[in-house]
Amino acid sequence: MIPPEIRRSVLLQKAIKLALAGTLLTFASFSATAADPSSDTETPQPPDILLGPLFNDVQNAKLLPDQKTFADAIPNSDPLMILADYRMQRNQSGFDLRHFVDVNFTLPKAGEKYVPPAGQSLREHIDGLWPVLTRSTKNVKKWDSLLPLPESYVVPGGRFREIYYWDSYFTMLGLAESGHWDKVADMVANFGYEIDAWGHIPNGNRTYYLSRSQPPFFAFMVELLAQHEGDDALKEYLPQLQKEYAYWMEGVETLQPGQQNQRVVKLEDGSVLNRYWDDRDTPRPESWVEDIATAKSNPNRPATEIYRDLRSAAASGWDFSSRWMDNPQQLSTIRTTTIVPVDLNALLYQLEKTLARASAAAGDRAKASQYDALANARQKAIEMHLWNNKEGWYADYDLQNNKIRDQLTAAALFPLYVNAAAKDRAAKVAAAAQAHQLQPGGLATTSVKSGQQWDAPNGWAPLQWVAAEGLQNYGQDDVAMEVTWRFLTNVQHTYDREKKLVEKYDVSSTGTGGGGGEYPLQDGFGWTNGVTLKMLDLICPQEKPCDSVPSTRPASLSATPTKTPSAATQ
C-alpha cells in the first residue's frame, strides 16, 4: 500500500494532465471575493465538480453516515493533485478508499453538545443558545466548500453548519426579541454581500448551494432592520433588493404567453408568476446517493429531470413534500418545476411592495409607482390563478395540467401573511385551516402522510408564525391564538422532557419532535428559537413578559402585527 506521505515526483507532475483529461475544474480565490464581491473571480465550483470521480466513488461507497459530511470536507491540498493521486492509486492492490479520504481531507467535526444549565426557563435557554449557534468565516481555508461572509452569523444547528437563507429570517426575529440588533444587522449585511457577490442569495453559504436560492425573505429582513434603524435601512439595501428582484425575474421580457424560463412563468392570459428552479440537473452533493436511488426508481423519466425537480424542491424549503409529487408515496414522481407555488408568489409580492417603499424613501417616486404596479399585477394574478374557488383556499397552480391544485397546505396562509388576500377569502382560509390543519400541537404542514418531512404529522416553526401573523392581519385572532398556543405548548412540553428545541415537531400530539425525511431530527434550532420568543411575547402582555409557556391559555393575544395593510385588506 502506498504510504500516506506521497512524494509527488516529476513523473507524477507530468501525469496530472493525462489523469485529469476531460475534467473541467474551475477555482476561485475566496479571500479576494470576500474582500471585494465585485472582483472579477470565477464562481467557485462544488465538490462534485472539483473532485469528479473521487467524489462519486466516496459517496457511493457510503463511507460516512451522512452524505453531507464529505460535501463539507476540506481538501488538505490542491484538489487537482488529490484527484491525480486518486486516479493513479485507486486500481492498485490494497488501495483503501477510507484511508485515502482520511489522509487527503479534513472532515467536519461534530459540534460539542450544548448542555444547558439546570433550571433554565425556555427564554433563558434560547438566549443562552445564541452565542453557541454563532459562526464566523474569518478562517475559511482554501478549497473549502464554505463560502466566506464578511460578518458573523447564526446557524440553525446540528448538521447545518452554515447559514441558510429563509431559516435566517425567523432566527433574526428571535435575535431582535433578545435585543441582538447588532447580529440582525450583521446577517442582513451578509445577505446583501451575497447578492452583490453571486447575483442572488444562495440556499446556504456552500459552493454546492450556489445553483439555487430559497424562499425570498430578504425584503422581510430589511423591513425588520428598518424597525430599528428607520428608512436608512431601506435606502441602504435598495440596490440589493433590486438585484434580488432581477434574479427572480430574469428572462421575463422574452417570454410569450404559455412559456417559462428558469424562475419565471407567463400564463396563457399574460399573467406573470414565479416558480422554484435550480440551475443544475445533477444529484445534490449533500444527498448524492439518495438522489441517484430516487432517479433509478423511476426509469420512465430522464434522471436529469428528476434531479432538477429534487433540487428545485430544496430551493422551495419544502424538501420534500407531497405538494410537489404526483404520487405522495413515490418521491421520483416529484415535479416541482411544473408547479407555481402560492407562497413564493406571495413573498415576491412582498418584495415588490418593499421595493416600492424603499424607492419612495430614496426619493424615487417614479420607481415606487412602477413597483406598486408590479405588486398590484401579481396580486391580481394570485387571486385569479392561485385561489381554489371550489375548495375555498389558496393553492398552487399546476402548469402541466393547466389548473389549480386541490391540496390544502400551510402555504395557503402566505397571501394573508403579506396582506395580499381579499377579506372574504381570508375568512375562508381561516375556516379551512381550523377545520383541516389545526392539530393538538400546532398547524400541520399538509394532511398527507407520505413519510416526507414537509407532510403530516409535522409542523414547522416558520409556518406557525406565518399562519399566526397572517390570521391576525385579517382579524382572525381566535384561530391565530389556537395556532400559537398549541405550538408553544408542544415546544414547551418537548423542552421540559428533553431540554432542547428541535427543527420540527409532530403536531398530532404535544411534546414530540418530528420525523421523516433524509436525516435524523436536528436540535438547536435557529428558527424554532426565533418563533418561540416571538410567540411568547404574543401570549404575554408587554408589561409582564413570560419566560416559559404559562400553564393556562390566555384569553387573547397581547400583540398584533405592525405591517401596513394593503388595499386588499381595507
Swiss-Prot record:
Residues 544-570 are annotated as: Disordered. Residues 554-570 have a biased composition (Low complexity). Substrate binds at R159, W166, D167, N203, R212, S213, Q214, R284, P285, E286, G317, E518. Keywords: Glycosidase, Hydrolase, Periplasm, Signal. Its EC number is 3.2.1.28. Gene3D superfamilies: 1.50.10.10. One of its GO terms (cellular component) is periplasmic space. It catalyses: alpha,alpha-trehalose + H2O = alpha-D-glucose + beta-D-glucose. Pfam families: Trehalase. Its main location: periplasm. Residues 1-34 form the signal peptide. Provides the cells with the ability to utilize trehalose at high osmolarity by splitting it into glucose molecules that can subsequently be taken up by the phosphotransferase-mediated uptake system. Belongs to the glycosyl hydrolase 37 family. Monomer. This is Periplasmic trehalase. It comes from Salmonella choleraesuis (strain SC-B67).
